[in-house]
Amino acid sequence: MSTTIKPILLLADSQLLFWRDEEGLPFLQRARTLMEEDDPGKAFKAAYLGASNGDASEFYELFLAAMGEIGIRDCRHVKASPSSEDRQFLEQADLILLAGGDIDRGWQAFEASGIQQKLIERYYAGALLIGISAGAVQLGLKGWNEESRQLFDTLRLVPFVVDAHDEPSWARLSQIVPKAGEHTKGVGIPSGAGAVYHPDFSMEPVRHPLVEISQTEEGVRQALLFPGETHEVEGAAEQVARPRVVSPEEAISLAMGALTPEDDKVN
């Protein structure tokens, strides 16, 4: 499996899963092309994480249809409480999609299962990550509880706070960015749009303009980022998460735990 770090696809909703550009090419073909560059001819595996929507089967069916459009047939719905088979598939997945839904609900499930650390590891091992709505938020710096608006750290693989389909005012993101830490920026992705975040810390809007929100001395500032242009993300290197370094002792402990049958483990 390739270890080339790939772009992250951030989608406001599922529209881009089936959208075709002016030349008639599926947007998701970009994902297929990126994987083919490293492993031409491989039968790719695609994992769907539906914890944020309560593992609703109808959204997984949409995922299967989208993967079929780009010729990926080996797919699996990795549940909020993943089985050993789910974990094994995720370890081998070339493409991983974080579904939309409730940001906090999904994040709590990721933390409870340890999936959040595995996603960071898979990203740095070369898997291509896609986040839709809540999933896109979880790939960024901060998530929040919808009722209390309490902030919490998320995967931090994308060096800004993400929000989706809250246009035109982006009031929620405008309130969150000043609370998220000094120099933190936010990116709002409107309905039907997306963003491609590249490993060189640049970002590419897709289909519709994005809104970048930052805190200045004069207050909250909004700027439009247009498709067809590449935008540098300032301070990205200091913001993004890095793979966790495991000590030799911890590696042995994890390996021994993996070899222990589930029925023999102490609850």
Question: How would you describe each model-predicted region?
Answer:
Residues 2-41, 50, 54-61, 65, ...:
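C-terminal and late-domain segments of enzyme folds
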Residues 10, 95-99, 130-131, 161-162:
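Structural motif
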Residues 44, 94, 159:
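Conserved acidic residues
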Residues 73-87:
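A short, well-structured beta->alpha microelement
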Residues 88-89, 154:
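Structural alpha-helical scaffold elements that stabilize or flank donor/cofactor-binding regions
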Residues 90-91, 123:
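A short, aliphatic-rich alpha-helical micro-motif
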Residues 105-111, 115-172:
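Class I SAM-dependent methyltransferase SAM-binding "motif I" and its flanking Rossmann-like core
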